Amino acid sequence: MFCTSFPRPRCPQYSNPINVKISQFGIEFIRGFGEAMAPYFPGEATPSLGFRDHGYLYCVSPEGADAARARVEMQRSLGAHTVYLDQGALKDRFPWLNVEDLAGGSWGSKDEGWFDSMGLLNGFRRAARAEGVEYIDNAVTGLEVEDDRVTSVKLSTGEVVSCGTLVNAAGPRAQQVAAMTGLSIPVMPHKRYSFVFASETPVPGRMPNVIDLSGTFVRPEGELFLTGNTPLDDGPADFDDFAIRHDEFEDRIWPALWHRIPAFDALRVMQSWCGHYEYNMLDHNGIVGFHPQIRNFMFANGFSGHGLQQSPAVGRAVSELILYGAFQTLDLTPFRYERIAANEPFLEEAVI
């Protein structure tokens, strides 16, 4: 899964109402994380995710203005604090932004930003272990299926672990796990490059995460900046291919940054890395729920681009299905596996 030790984003600016609701629960969970985790950190400082409430700013072209306004209206109807800024208002609020080719921008004025991904992961792990969960550092090499159920899991060391319910949360390798039962899902690894850079000229004020028309995003990371984009040759990658292409920054990212934020005329890359999105090629949305034939095989896949921020709601949904056999809080039925088999996309357009 594409994730880093750098703070990762969360944002309810989706084209799909259910994704807005999922992320709204995410911000509620993130804000209450310290209190929820306190019992698992006795005698220690209450953990904090360092949430930076700077917002997201989606740049909007003249051709996309009507659709952007409609998305903002939908998001606000669900309680999100998104606002549409026309070209003049956008320049007034963010004077360092080049708006000449923009109709405006969609900006999350509250409850949007980024947080410490490793803090979230470590909190989850600590709480799970305290509740009796055992983590096994091993690779799954096979699944035994009998009477339409996964009965055991074979590990690379030869061990066999019995199975009551199997949740496929294997990220970019989700299809490899599905194939062990003869199933197929359109989730494949797609390479994404991230670059941390220094700028000779600072950007004043409270800078949001800016998503350019080109698909390039950039946001502050302390005194530095974090940026990335969708590579021009985007497509399924080898599972073990993490080679980075530095020309992606020189040829595509930097020109886009300089055009949108003229202060970025002199930059120096300080750090870079490559990770994999678990990319659902059908509709850019997650897959959540049991398989209709292999009854104890559950999917929780395909969320990259919005995975970390949606993990609290998806984790809760998975737990509800295991415990009660149905969703109890937020109905994630539209993410069901059956839409994959029927080739019925449930599209999400706002994925970075």
What does each of the following model-derived ranges do?
Residues 157-206:
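Central helical "cap/lid" subdomain
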Residues 117, 255-352:
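C-terminal catalytic lobe of FAD-dependent flavoproteins
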Residues 105-127, 171-173, 249-256, 303, ...:
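Mid-domain beta-loop-alpha active-site segment that forms a flexible
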Residues 2-93, 215-217, 257:
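Dinucleotide-binding Rossmann-like beta1-alpha1 core, especially the glycine-rich loop
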Residues 199-296:
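Active-site lid/adjacent beta-loop-alpha segment flanking the redox-cofactor pocket in flavoenzymes
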Residues 51-53, 135-137, 186-192, 262-274, ...:
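A short coil-to-beta-strand element that immediately follows conserved catalytic motifs
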Residues 101, 106-165:
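Helical element adjacent to the flavin cofactor pocket in flavoenzyme catalytic cores
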Residues 21-24, 58-67, 107-126, 241-249:
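Short beta-strand to alpha-helix junction loop
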